[in-house]
Amino acid sequence: MTFKPELATHTLEAEGLRCPEPVMMVRKTIRNMQDGDVLLVKADDPSTTRDIPSFCRFMDHQLVGQATETLPYQYLIRKGLEA
């Protein structure tokens, strides 16, 4: 999975927040986006490496990229399953 932050149409800074806050903020932000929009999430909570991919599967969004080797962790989430 290649990480391309330039795909993002929205950004969410979730650094300093701890579980469950990052995923709650992702859900709230995505709710206000259009299908096909891409959210860049920046977080430093280790639980996001598990929680954000699970959120995408459960809520039918696409995790189109992630960079979790260094802090902050970064995720690209496309709203909906259709590109």
From Swiss-Prot:
One GO BP: tRNA wobble position uridine thiolation
One Gene Ontology cellular component annotation held by this UniProt entry: cytoplasm
Alphabetical UniProt keywords: Cytoplasm
Active-site residues from the entry: C19
Keyword Cytoplasm: yes
Annotated PANTHER family: SULFUR CARRIER PROTEIN TUSA, SULFUR CARRIER PROTEIN YEDF-RELATED
Identification of the protein by name: Sulfur carrier protein TusA
Organism from which the protein derives: Vibrio atlanticus (strain LGP32)
